[in-house]
């Protein structure tokens, strides 16, 4: 919104008119005096910001509007808008003032409206208002109803002498009105005019051409030089890469994720923050910043571990294919083709993960911002309500009491805002950590899915033999177990070293704070002694009051100057030290990263020469453990060196300042006192006493610092014990062993599985095993979130108690009532605010930590149970689908047999066919006996072949065992007594291997049995499908002969198939009709045959009517019986008394869940469980008695022998049950 106009003789200028709105006045209070608005006159319209486009340039400040939606919500919108028009030399400004009494639920009518518009510096042309001598024009309106708008407008031009170039002119407008509650309210609409200069430039085309040519030549030379150096660097790099390819032509693996520059730069950036925290000028926020840095470091460590897992999995796949090629099971061409397919799929997966990560981060950021705005809005509303209530209470108290209460209220609001900000930060960190975990789990599952899908695709294309694919998948599954164990070790190592790193950093920060406390104590002691010296001379009568005030003023001035100089020197020296520390730290860390990258590159090269995956994983384990320990040792040394340098700097400068204060006391102040006739002996006695006090104070502060340091060391040791490496590794091994037993037990429950089902089950189990680990960041963040929520809930409960006591003082205790008897409401409010502030400073009860620990344990157990339940549900669904299909086929076949019997009976009774004709029809349409006999023979052959193959495998195993022997070497030259112990030791060492072989053999037996059962079921299903098809043809033929109507046949099907749905019945009826049409097409009838069929139809019509009525009666009776049965069952269920479902926390015990550790929350409180114990769950008062069996769970991995079944007997029994 602007226009150009004359501002003088030398140039042109632009008028920028910013019209702001102070929207929505609130009627504050109901007292007789008018309260001026406390809102700042701010808005988006500023002198350097153009107004919005449109006919009227107006704006509304969002924060002001928010304040307008206060507790009364009777807002009035007051606007001053402008529009500039005309040519550059003669611009006119059209100004409009509007008062809008918006229609809200609590709006009121306004009266005695007075608008004061400042027009200083404007030449008003047309205005209905009254001008005053002070440059203000007034507008009056006696009454304004709700929903009406009052506006006035006028035109004006700017006085050329009023403003110069770049200057601003404020012309606000004010509105004063009266509400029905006799409150006078004043609103202000800021309005700013800014003059911007426009300089006319006369172009010189010759100069422009010369400048263009010179710039073009310089840029051309620079481009040529840059391309030359770039090409030279590429040539050198290409030569090095070609030499590396010549030395290692078969190394086609991708580089390790730890060699990427992104990970190194992230690590360097996070380490720079440590130096920033140590050199911070706000010691109180160091621990909070260190906590945020720990969460960021844990997230980065999770990302590094996930990248390491992906790289190892890719290398394992390449290694397995190379072993197959070397063993002759896979051709090199197929291996290259599969490697290219794997690489393409992995690249697509990485792109998908990256896109999903960006999408999730954008969504989470937007959601967190929205949540922050909502909570900030609610917090602001609560603060406004509290301020209104406090103003109402503090109306009739002294200014001192009101100022104290206002200060306490502001302090309380500041603490609440900090607590809310911390809660929002933790919630956002939890959302991000949860998103990272979900993406990591998704990537792991997709990686396994790619492997299984590519191998199945290779088998279907004929590129891979089924037995080779089976071998490869078995090796992959077995290797993935080793990979999971390796990643557990990596995670435990990272957890331990990061816990040690941040425990040491927390120790350094607190030591730094203790050192600063000691230094400040010495400074304060020296400053106190200086003033004490003057006061002692005044009390002794050697100084009068004027002299004392003069000396005190000088002493305070000198002390302030010394402290100010110390602060400035510390600030400057810390900046220099910060830069030096970062430079040295980056140099050493970068050097260490380069050394480790070289070793990791050599490890990647060694993967191509590794004999098997176990050797490759062992190399990863040793190298990563060594690198992690070396890097942590370097970072700990750098942190300690940074603290030492900072400590030396702070102590030297502080001692210098303390020495200056003491010198001021012993020289300058002593001379001033001696000039004023102070006795030397008295002065010397005071100086000696101060010297002894200084020495004692120094000794006391140093002892306190040493004691604090010992406490911090104990805290670091306790933290390291909680995150012990061996404990976490053992816990994960125990958990994986338990889940392996559970999954094997669930798998053995499956009776029949095909090869595709086995692959799907194996992939599902692999995905479940890959989720048994715990990320580094998410558990720690979740523990802090729960702790923060528990603290906020506890504090809110305490606040409610305090507010209830403030609202009803008579409910307080007698002693408290006597103490507060002489106090007024202001004293009670002050005490209430002090108690609330004290709650923020106090620690939460210990019971909250126990409650948080119980919730964390319950959440982890629920996640594990959910994985088991999901795996079990997939197996049950698979088996249920097979059983449902078989049961449906059998029921349909039984129903067809029943309908055949019914139709043949009607044909025989109506003498349409003789018995011999019926027998002939059955013999021609029912070859089921031969089908069933053939099926029985096939099943027996399959079983015999399976038993022979199993016996052959057992025989070969025993032959290998007899040929190889037990594998125990006899010790050479050893005592006979010690030979037995040595052989026994060897046998015990080989026991684990034998057990694994036995478990593998059991798994193979179960898989072979499941596959055999599935093949037998497939043969049975095919036979039953053939029988159903033949039965449908016979039913169609008989229904054509009996002339049965379609509706009657449908009701007949509903009777013999009561569990079938209407679509299934209609599909079956359509199948019968298709068979019927086939017969009709085969046997075309002539006219005489049509007349015969018509007579037959009339003959059977009576019988079908009787049968139809009987079916109707049967259906009605069956429906009534079902309704009665359902009503009785409902009544029985409602009469039962159920125990209410309680939330239980499953604690670890022998013979149950393995031991599960938790993230540390304060001091640990162990929960012992032995035998039958009564426990209080989460302090709810509910007692639960837990009984534990001392025996381990009996989980048999042996599949029971399959019982042979006689299909004919089973079919007859099922048919008899169906007819019954």
Swiss-Prot record:
GO biological process, one term: smoothened signaling pathway
Coiled coil: 355-404, 563-644, 854-875, 920-1005
A Pfam short name: EVC2_like
Source organism phylogeny: Eukaryota, Metazoa, Chordata, Craniata, Vertebrata
Keywords: Cell membrane, Cell projection, Cilium, Coiled coil, Cytoplasm, Cytoskeleton, Glycoprotein, Membrane, Nucleus, Signal, Transmembrane, Transmembrane helix
Gene: Evc2
Cited function: Component of the EvC complex that positively regulates ciliary Hedgehog (Hh) signaling. Plays a critical role in bone formation and skeletal development. May be involved in early embryonic morphogenesis.
Transmembrane stretches, start-end: 211-231
InterPro entries registered for this protein in UniProt: Limbin, Limbin/EVC
Record-given protein name: Limbin
